[in-house]
A protein has these predicted regions:
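Juxta-kinase regulatory segment immediately upstream of eukaryotic protein kinase catalytic domains
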Residues: 1-32
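ATP-binding pocket architecture of kinase catalytic cores
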Residues: 34-136
């Protein structure tokens, strides 16, 4: 069994076992969960209910040696929220009660994998927009 499949029941149990009253977009919903993608440092699952589509990210490592890696990602996404160039973060849990590392729930942005030859100009424009975002 691969890591994505191994964590899938835990993701489902987490979604069912938590009271989501503090996260308005998730309140009172029953979610479908499907593996989305695995990176070097995160496992990503698409969660959906009706027209709502989100990403449930399980942190599994860090390249910058941070114990609070998922909180760091959440805060970075919060800072970029106004840019419109990054997914909106909705929830972070770094308590480590259900997962050895933290989890993050964020907006799902549809698209295709980056093709450097085809997408370099668009990627450069996106990075320029991100770098122009004012932060407090």
């Amino acid at each position: 069994m691969d890591r994505m499949e191994e964590f899938l029941p835990r993701v489902r149990a987490y979604l069912v076992g938590r009271d989501w009253t503090d996260v308005p977009c998730m309140r009172g919903r029953t979610f479908e969960v499907a593996p989305l993608a695995q990176g070097e440092y995160n496992l990503n699952y698409r969660i959906s209910a009706g027209g709502l589509r989100l990403v449930f990210r399980v942190n599994i490592g860090t390249q910058i040696q941070r114990r609070d890696q998922i909180v760091y990602e959440y805060r970075a996404l919060k800072l970029l929220e106004r840019s419109g160039a990054a997914p909106r973060p909705y929830f972070v849990d770094d308590s480590r009660r259900r997962f050895e590392t933290g989890i993050l729930i964020m907006e799902f942005l549809p698209g295709a994998p980056l093709d450097y030859r085809r997408d370099s100009a668009a990627a450069a424009a996106l990075f320029a927009r991100i770098h122009q975002t004012e932060v407090p």
